[in-house]
């Protein structure tokens, strides 16, 4: 039996009665954002809009981005990352469950010293992939060139934000590299592991 998105009571300051809002809208009001799906243009635009709005509303209060994502599209993910770097409030990133592929890229993009993983979380990095199978040869070559540029961008960010040498990141991105929360901390993707 699907229950949909749960609703919770919320009382607007100055109002007599509470109104029922979905749990995510209630949490957004507390500056708690969630990426609990594959990264695509829709979720990217929603998160970007929320971060910009929250930054305008109060640029001194921190934002928390909870991540449980198998990854997703590179360009929408990079747009979220760029917004995290652009907004004035510090963005904490918290991995719960899985931060794979673009999810791990967003995790490492949090404010350095404020990136956290839950104790049983998993993190995975790898290189960007393309699904451009039915293309003409010329289009395929252009796609491959674009993929190499994107890989270079992602690699540069991982190097900058983890402190790992370029050759280590490049080598590790050749395949799927899964890490425990402690491994991700040692790698520099997160700064802290929550205690059990």
Curated annotation (Swiss-Prot):
Active site: 101 (nucleophile), 126
Family matches, as InterPro entries: ClpP, ClpP/crotonase-like_dom_sf, ClpP/TepA, ClpP_His_AS, ClpP_Ser_AS
Gene Ontology biological process terms, A to Z: protein quality control for misfolded or incompletely synthesized proteins
Primary location recorded for the protein, binned into one broad class: plastid
Role noted for this protein: Cleaves peptides in various proteins in a process that requires ATP hydrolysis. Has a chymotrypsin-like activity. Plays a major role in the degradation of misfolded proteins.
Annotated Gene Ontology cellular component terms: endopeptidase Clp complex; plastid stroma
Descriptive protein name: ATP-dependent Clp protease proteolytic subunit
Keywords: Hydrolase, Plastid, Protease, Serine protease
PANTHER family assigned to the protein according to its UniProt record, in alphabetical order: ATP-DEPENDENT CLP PROTEASE PROTEOLYTIC SUBUNIT, CHLOROPLASTIC ATP-DEPENDENT CLP PROTEASE PROTEOLYTIC SUBUNIT 1
Catalytic function, reaction form: Hydrolysis of proteins to small peptides in the presence of ATP and magnesium. alpha-casein is the usual test substrate. In the absence of ATP, only oligopeptides shorter than five residues are hydrolyzed (such as succinyl-Leu-Tyr-|-NHMec, and Leu-Tyr-Leu-|-Tyr-Trp, in which cleavage of the -Tyr-|-Leu- and -Tyr-|-Trp bonds also occurs)
Assigned protein family: Belongs to the peptidase S14 family.
């Amino acid at each position: 039996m699907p229950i949909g998105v749960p609703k919770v009571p919320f009382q607007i300051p100055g109002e007599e009665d509470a109104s029922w809002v979905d749990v995510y809208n209630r949490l957004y009001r507390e500056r708690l954002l969630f990426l609990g799906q594959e990264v695509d243009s829709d979720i990217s635009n929603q998160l970007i809009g929320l971060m910009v709005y929250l930054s305008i509303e109060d640029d001194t209060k921190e934002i928390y981005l909870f991540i449980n994502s198998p990854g997703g599209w590179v360009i929408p993910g990079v747009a979220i990352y760029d917004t995290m770097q652009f907004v004035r409030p510090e963005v904490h990133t918290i991995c719960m469950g899985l931060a794979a592929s673009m999810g791990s890229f967003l995790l490492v993009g949090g404010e350095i010293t404020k990136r956290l993983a839950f104790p049983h979380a998993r993190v995975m990095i790898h290189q960007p992939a393309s699904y451009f199978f039915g293309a003409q040869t010329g289009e395929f070559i252009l796609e491959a060139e674009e993929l190499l540029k994107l890989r270079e961008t992602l690699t540069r960010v991982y190097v900058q934000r983890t402190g790992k040498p370029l050759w280590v990141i490049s080598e590790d991105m050749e395949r799927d590299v899964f890490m425990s929360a402690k491994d991700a901390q040692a790698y520099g993707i997160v700064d802290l592991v929550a205690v059990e």
